[in-house]
């Protein structure tokens, strides 16, 4: 299964912020097999993007010694792809401090992902261009923004 993730936030970073994330899992026949949408207040778009990817890692990540390939996960967030594919390893080595001597934002989510990574779990996280017409990325965006519900996504694309 291939996953597409997205996060969204209105009034990003403010006390009145309302955000959400969407996850879409598509099988080899281009049928939606899994959707997830969650929302919360007092958040940021980056936090929601990270949560979507973390959800896939925790629920569908493949342990290195298991049979099979890790699931491919597409995100349109360069921040998230770079965080989980590169930056977190340097931050962990330096005691979770960035080069500017600051603690990374969303450290709780990054450390949760890193802990699973250290246990041998993997996903194949890749960057996709956002809002470029990919129907599954667009569906993840619609779930994240609340434009479409999980039930509507299954009924339309399942």
Enumerate the language-model features and the residues they cover.
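Short, conserved alpha-helix that lines the donor NDP-sugar binding/gating region
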Residues: 49, 53
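RNase H-like nuclease fold core
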Residues: 1-47, 58-62, 141, 145-152, ...
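RNase H catalytic domain
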Residues: 8-14, 55-139
């Amino acid at each position: 299964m291939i996953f597409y993730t997205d996060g969204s936030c209105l009034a990003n970073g403010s006390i009145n912020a309302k955000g959400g994330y969407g996850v879409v899992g598509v099988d080899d026949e281009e049928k939606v097999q899994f959707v997830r949408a969650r929302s919360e207040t007092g958040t940021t778009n980056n936090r929601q993007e990270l949560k979507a990817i973390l959800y896939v890692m925790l629920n569908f990540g493949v342990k290195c010694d298991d049979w099979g390939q890790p699931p491919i996960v597409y995100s349109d967030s360069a921040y998230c792809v770079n965080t989980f594919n590169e930056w977190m390893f340097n931050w962990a080595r330096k005691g979770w401090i960035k080069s500017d001597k600051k603690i990374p934002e969303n450290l709780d989510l990054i450390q949760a992902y890193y802990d699973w990574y250290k246990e041998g779990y993997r996903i194949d996280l890749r960057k996709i261009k956002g809002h470029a017409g990919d129907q599954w990325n667009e569906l993840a965006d619609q779930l994240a923004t609340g434009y479409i519900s999980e039930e509507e996504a299954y009924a339309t694309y399942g």
